[in-house]
A protein has these predicted regions:
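Glycine-rich segments within core transmembrane alpha-helices of 12-TM secondary carriers
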Residues: 67, 147-173, 185-191, 296, ...
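Intracellular loop-helix junctions on the cytosolic face of multi-pass helical membrane proteins
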Residues: 1-17, 142-147, 168-285, 307, ...
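Hydrophobic core of transmembrane alpha-helices in multi-pass small-molecule transporters
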Residues: 111-128, 351-372
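Central cavity-lining transmembrane alpha-helices of secondary-active solute carriers
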Residues: 60-79, 294-309
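Intracellular juxtamembrane helix-capping segments at the cytosolic ends
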Residues: 127-141, 371-385
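Conserved MFS/SLC helix-loop-helix module at the cytosolic interface between two early adjacent transmembrane helices
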Residues: 71-100
Length: 450
């Protein structure tokens, strides 16, 4: 009876403050991720900076990369020195100012202002991203609600991404790049006010002091120091090895996953005369390339609950759930197939435009690959990392995505030296081979965490 009552508990109102804050922030971020790649490579006459597609890819890659690195430091600051309730709205304010720098870049034709935008948005994300989740988690007295709560929060993230990327192209082509950056900034300024007033109303005292303040250890300081100085056991070393192994494969996955967006815009997309290798027309309507990003968000919204049900059913079956190694391998296999399809579409089209359904298939497969293992990284690390190095190990995952983010722009530049079909077909084959190897060695790798 008690369990039934618990499942019917309402989420605290502060949870919805945090979740909707994520929606506003992600609306702006994913819009800007698409916008910066387009704006940088568009000609001066078209309102862009007039740089190359590889410059656009690298700029977009830097935005992705540094927004994964800075939350490591932002969490450290909120843990020890500055109130998370200050960090979070300060972060959204800095992001808003960053997007205003994008507006100034469009007004002045300044590359330096785009770099300043990336810096401010990255610092702001560092103060916001992890700390808003930290506040959110502490709002719940019943910790059994956390898994479902963060699943719902993830849906709010994807809703923000979907709305932003679906609408942004109309704004960009309707009123220009500069005003579009202003729209992104206004979303963050609104988010700042939402957090300040919503936090006052519904957060109570949570987050007023750094997270580590008032948190007590069961161990005495003397015992803790003794524990920290003891060498790692053989099992702990094996588990750390397993974490690094999964992380290594995740770097390969994310480099290729983020790379997908570059040929979609600069090879297949309708935005550049030298691209346009696919037919984006439906009747008299040209499908915006930003909707490829929208497709990813929509897939996460639709297939997320379905996959969760599949994993739950699998976990309750006699065979049990797939291991993290197999889920990582499955994600890589799906992504590899997406690249093989993209290379195949290039061969099949000949001198004509490819059917848009090829692009849709690529988007669905890469999204499914993401959903198979992406949400499980921190869970895997939290489950198997030795407690004394948990913080360090949790930092490994976002650092891996930072490395991937920094790399994909350069990989896109390198692949541009070769014919499209063989270059991207080889990338797909490499990812498929990695997935097959990881799947086949699953039993051996699982001994590391048993």
């Amino acid at each position: 009876m008690e369990n039934t009552v618990k499942t019917k508990k309402k989420y605290p109102k502060g949870f919805y403050v945090c979740a909707f804050s994520f929606t506003l922030e992600r609306m702006a971020f994913y819009s800007c991720k698409w916008l910066i790649a387009l704006f940088v490579a568009k000609t001066l006459l078209e309102g862009g900076l007039g740089l190359t597609d590889t410059d656009g890819a690298k700029m977009s890659a830097n935005l992705v990369a540094f927004t994964y690195l800075t939350p490591i430091f932002g969490g450290w600051i909120a843990d020890r020195w500055v109130s998370p309730r200050i960090c979070v709205p300060l972060g959204t304010l800095l992001m808003g100012l960053g997007y205003l720098c994008g507006w100034q870049s469009a007004t002045q034709g300044s590359v330096a202002m785009i770099w300043l935008m990336i810096i401010l948005v990255s610092i702001g994300t560092g103060l916001f991203k992890g700390n808003i989740s930290g506040i959110n988690g502490r709002l719940f007295e019943d910790k059994a609600q956390l898994d479902s709560a963060f699943t719902i929060q993830y849906s709010f993230v994807n809703i923000g991404s979907f709305i932003g990327t679906t609408a942004i192209s109309f704004v960009a082509y309707g009123i220009g790049f500069g005003p579009t950056f202003i729209v992104c900034a206004l979303l963050l300024f609104l988010d700042t006010l939402w957090l300040i007033f919503g936090g006052r109303a519904y957060f109570g005292d949570i987050g007023k002091k750094p997270f580590k303040i008032n948190e007590t250890n069961i161990e005495s300081e003397k015992d803790k120091q003794k524990s920290d100085s003891e060498p790692l056991t053989k099992q702990e070393k094996h588990r750390i090895g397993a974490i690094f192994l999964v992380t290594l494969f995740s770097v390969i996955f994310w480099v290729v996953w983020y790379l997908t967006y570059m040929p979609i815009m600069y090879h297949w997309g309708p935005d550049f005369d030298y691209a346009n290798k696919a037919n984006w027309m439906i009747g008299n309507f040209t499908v915006p390339s930003a909707w490829f990003d929208s497709l990813n968000a929509l897939c996460c919204i639709i297939f997320g609950p379905i996959l969760a049900a599949v994993w739950t059913k699998r976990a309750n079956s006699p065979k049990g759930d797939l291991s993290m190694f197999k889920k990582t391998a499955l994600g890589m296999l799906l992504l590899g197939v997406a690249f093989v399809i993209m290379a195949g579409a290039e061969v099949i089209r000949g001198e004509n435009q490819a059917n848009l359904m090829w692009i849709v298939a690529v988007g669905i497969l890469m999204s499914l690959g993401e959903m198979v293992f992406s949400p499980l990284g921190n869970s895997f690390i939290s489950k198997f990392s030795p407690p004394r190095v948990l913080g360090l190990m949790l930092g490994v995952w976002p650092f891996a995505i930072f490395i991937a983010g920094k790399s994909y722009g350069y990989l896109y530049e390198y692949l541009g030296k070769y014919s499209f079909a063989p270059a991207y077909g080889i990338v797909g084959a490499i990812v498929l081979i990695c997935g097959i190897v990881l799947w086949s060695l699953d039993k051996k790798f699982n001994t590391l965490v048993e």
